[in-house]
């Protein structure tokens, strides 16, 4: 289980450059709109130094990180919800993703044209958010018409669903985001099947120049917008990231040291996406493989077992658990057992990030 994050943005904001760096896919990042029409998909390993630390102790035959999927969706333009600039296709592609990474241009460069002729992150964000809201408004209005008929017939579920739709309708009419409405669990469940675009967790990826991480008024503007929406901002320099992506591991370390950076910005993008979707990692560690697995925060041990195989959940008996810190501190399973840090947990155990687990099951 990974997740699918759609990378969106206006044409020429650095979206494909960023995606290429993420996946080393080498898509045509040409300096004109719509050079990405079919979405390009890349599966990216989740950067997690804990895997290497576990492998140092266990000495497995192989190491397998958990992954996530990024989808490069063509540059959206004003009017996309009415089909402008191949808009319908783009919006349908976004609908299939779990989260949105919205790339916003926060740099000046006369060689790279901006579709609106000027750099204004607020305008750029408004343009895309308006298109997403208009697409949702269309879905919402059609749903209301259908639900009214069922509600009149006394359908309780339809009545509740209708009340939620009527709650979000005025927000969408004002080009607002459904995610800022503060719907409760029951309300969210009622409209889940509609896959609303403005309900998807969103991070703003601010594409800056090499020296644009500080004292950058464009970046400050994006942070202000995100704070109002409850969204995350991850500043990166796509140009630097594409250079880093071409280097081997040794050169990468040197290059980052020269720039005074601890890790590639893309690692922050991937981790922010992970957090956005409320995901966490647990590990299995044996001589055959040390492997990372993705589960939702709050998942029980049987649900975590199901990620490996559904049989593990069906026949779940117990989970053997060692906290990651204990596994490292006591140099593996035997040391953790001697220190009393190895434990057996039942089906109600809530998995913690970094747990090293082994499942006992019977099918």
From Swiss-Prot:
Residues reported to bind Mg(2+): 16, 36
Stretches assigned to the OBG-type G domain: 3-256
Keywords: ATP-binding, Magnesium, Metal-binding, Nucleotide-binding
Keyword Repeat: no
Gene3D superfamilies reported in the protein's UniProt record: 3.10.20.30, P-loop containing nucleotide triphosphate hydrolases, TGS-like domain
InterPro entries given in the database record: ATPase_YchF/OLA1, Beta-grasp_dom_sf, G_OBG, GTP-bd, P-loop_NTPase, TGS, TGS-like, TGS-like_dom_sf
Any GO CC annotation of this UniProt entry: cytoplasm
Pfam families: MMR_HSR1, YchF-GTPase_C
GO MF entries: ATP binding; ATP hydrolysis activity; GTP binding; metal ion binding; ribosomal large subunit binding
Binding of ATP, residues: 12-17
Family from the record: Belongs to the TRAFAC class OBG-HflX-like GTPase superfamily. OBG GTPase family. YchF/OLA1 subfamily.
NCBIfam families membership: redox-regulated ATPase YchF (TIGR00092)
Domain text: Composed of 3 distinct structural domains: the N-terminal domain, which has a mononucleotide binding fold typical for the P-loop NTPases, followed by a pronounced alpha-helical coiled coil domain and the C-terminal domain, which may be involved in RNA binding.
Protein role: ATPase that binds to both the 70S ribosome and the 50S ribosomal subunit in a nucleotide-independent manner. Does not hydrolyze GTP.
UniProt-recorded name of the protein: Ribosome-binding ATPase YchF
Species assigned in the record: Haemophilus influenzae (strain ATCC 51907 / DSM 11121 / KW20 / Rd)
Taxonomic lineage from the root: Bacteria, Pseudomonadati, Pseudomonadota, Gammaproteobacteria, Pasteurellales
């Amino acid at each position: 289980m990974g997740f699918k994050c759609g990378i969106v943005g206006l044409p020429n904001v650095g979206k494909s450059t960023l995606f290429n760096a993420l996946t080393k896919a080498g898509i045509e990042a040409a300096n004109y709109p719509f050079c990405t029409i079919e979405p390009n998909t890349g599966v990216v390993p989740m950067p997690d130094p804990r895997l290497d630390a576990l492998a140092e102790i266990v000495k497995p035959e192989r190491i397998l990180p958990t992954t996530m999927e990024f989808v490069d969706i063509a540059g959206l333009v004003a009017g996309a919800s009415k089909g402008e600039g191949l808009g319908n296709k783009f919006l349908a592609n976004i609908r299939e993703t779990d989260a949105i990474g919205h790339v916003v241009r926060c740099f000046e460069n006369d060689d790279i044209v901006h579709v609106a002729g000027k750099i204004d992150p607020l305008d750029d964000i408004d343009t895309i958010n308006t298109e997403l809201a208009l697409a949702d408004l269309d879905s919402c209005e059609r749903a209301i018409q259908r639900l009214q008929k069922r509600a009149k017939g006394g359908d309780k579920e339809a009545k509740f669903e209708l009340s939620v739709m009527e709650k979000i309708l005025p927000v969408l009419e004002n080009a607002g985001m459904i995610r800022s409405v503060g719907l409760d669990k029951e309300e969210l469940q009622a409209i889940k099947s509609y896959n609303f675009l403005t309900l998807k967790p969103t991070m703003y990826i601010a594409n800056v120049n090499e020296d644009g991480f500080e004292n950058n008024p464009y970046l400050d503007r994006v942070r202000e917008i995100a704070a109002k929406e409850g969204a995350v901002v991850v500043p990166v320099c796509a140009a630097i990231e594409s250079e880093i992506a071409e280097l081997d591991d040794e050169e990468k370390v040197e290059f980052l040291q020269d720039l005074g950076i601890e890790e590639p910005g893309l690692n922050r993008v991937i981790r922010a996406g992970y957090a956005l979707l409320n995901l966490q990692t647990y590990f299995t560690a044996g001589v055959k493989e040390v492997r990372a697995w993705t589960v939702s925060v709050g998942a029980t041990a049987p649900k975590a077992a199901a990620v490996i195989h559904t049989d593990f959940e069906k026949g779940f008996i117990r989970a053997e658990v060692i906290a990651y810190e204990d596994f490292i501190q006591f140099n593996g399973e035997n040391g953790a057992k001697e220190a009393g840090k190895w434990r057996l947990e039942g089906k109600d155990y809530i998995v913690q990030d970094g747990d090293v687990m082994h499942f006992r099951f019977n099918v």
